[in-house]
């Protein structure tokens, strides 16, 4: 008998329960570790008389956690939750709803990362997405899936409050209305992404939804040590916008219409401060830097201000000319009178 081969087949380390992603996240039950003293077994076998049985005692080591305990701890705690109010067109709301549906129920094992772009998938009409407002090269445009950044930004906030590791995040060209400046997360299929990692010891579940008024993201997991997170931001730099005028010949010369709302440029530093269950600060670190572009205010006008100034100067010069002619005529009249 080859005891080395027997040992390879019998020996196993204790295994804690886990989830099997390949089997719809079924619970894989805990297993006890099995071992025996290989050298002692060899000596017993060598010294045994031919034809006699040799008993080899096995040692069993239980797993650190039972299957029942594991089931009770799975997704037991709400690690964080964040909601934002959804506004805009029906197309935009449809895109928000779809993005939330595609992400809802995602489970991440310890150490596993989540890509928002891969979670939502390609933004195609076949998958239900519609054209909605978006940004391209700093300009507001209609793009397929416009609006899904609100779900990624809401998820970003939830991940920060759950104290999860952020791997990739980008800010919009301009601050968003639904989250504070410095705390948004823009995405683009085939481009910038929002990615985070489950750096806890247990699986986490992403729960995302849209109820017709707001979109929400809740992170479910297992909190082993109580904590809380405070997020705060600092405006590092500002850049004021300018007011510009564009000629629109369909307007009267004294008419003007606001075409583009001005937005101040901002550079914002965000921070994540983490407390333990007793309120003591565990960490207080910079989170991300966000650079938002300025957008100039634009008015459509029937006549450009410089043209108005020219007309004003012309009118003033005309008034001066008329006044000079009047003075000249008066002087000439007075002169004639004197001569007479």
Place the predicted regions along the sequence by residue.
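Well-ordered beta-sheet/strand-loop patches within structured domains
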Residues: 1-340
